[in-house]
C-alpha cells in the first residue's frame, strides 16, 4: 500500500454528513488491501499524478444512502472491492486516466473485475475480486 490507505477507502463525505459509521469489517480488510496493492497502486504509479477516492468501501447503510445497488462491489459482495476514483481535474483528465487504466488492463499489467467510465468521465469505477476470475470488463455508464 504505497499510494492509498485503508482510511481513504473508508472515508465518505456522505457518511460524515449523515453520521454513518463506515468502517471496513475485519473480514473485508483483505479485499481492500488487494484492491490497493494489485489495482490502485499500479494505476497511480503509471499515472504519476494524485488520484483521489470518491467512494471506496460502503457499509449497507451508506450504500443505501448513496443509492447504490444491493449487489454493489463497494460492499465487498462476492469477495470483491471497489473504488470510485478521480483526478479532481475534470473530465478530460479523468478520460486520460481511464485510458491509462484501460491500457494497463489490455496489456495484462493489472486485472480488474470492472472498469467503468461513469457519467462521461465524472469519475471512474474500478473493482477487483480477490477470489475467482476478474472479468476485465471495460464499460461506460
Residue ranges and their predicted role:
Residues 35, 39, 62, 81, ...:
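Amphipathic alpha-helical interface surfaces
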Residues 46-48, 78-82:
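Short connector loops at helix/strand junctions that flank enzyme active sites
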Residues 37-68:
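Extended, low-complexity, intrinsically disordered C-terminal regulatory tails
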Residues 8, 13-15, 61, 66, ...:
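Solvent-exposed, flexible loop/coil residues
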Residues 73-79, 87-141:
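Catalytic cores and adjacent binding grooves of peptidoglycan-active enzymes
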Residues 1-46, 135-141:
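Extracytoplasmic cell-surface/polysaccharide-interacting catalytic and binding patches
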Residues 51, 83, 124:
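A broad, low-specificity signal marking well-ordered, structured residues that form hydrophobic/aromatic
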Amino acid at each position: 500500500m504505497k499510494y492509498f490507505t485503508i482510511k481513504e477507502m473508508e472515508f465518505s463525505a456522505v457518511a460524515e454528513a449523515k453520521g454513518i459509521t463506515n468502517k471496513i469489517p475485519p473480514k473485508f480488510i483483505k479485499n481492500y488491501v488487494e484492491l490497493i496493492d494489485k489495482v490502485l497502486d499500479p494505476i497511480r504509479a503509471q499515472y504519476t499524478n494524485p488520484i483521489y477516492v470518491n467512494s471506496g468501501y460502503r457499509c449497507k447503510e451508506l450504500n443505501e444512502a448513496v443509492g447504490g445497488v444491493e449487489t454493489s462491489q463497494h460492499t465487498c459482495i462476492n469477495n470483491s472491492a471497489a473504488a470510485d476514483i478521480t483526478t479532481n481535474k475534470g473530465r478530460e483528465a479523468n478520460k486520460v486516466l481511464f485510458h491509462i487504466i484501460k491500457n494497463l488492463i489490455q496489456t495484462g499489467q493489472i486485472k480488474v473485475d470492472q472498469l467503468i467510465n461513469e457519467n462521461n468521465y465524472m469519475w471512474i469505477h474500478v473493482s477487483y475480486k480477490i477470489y475467482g476470475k476478474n472479468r476485465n470488463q471495460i464499460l461506460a455508464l
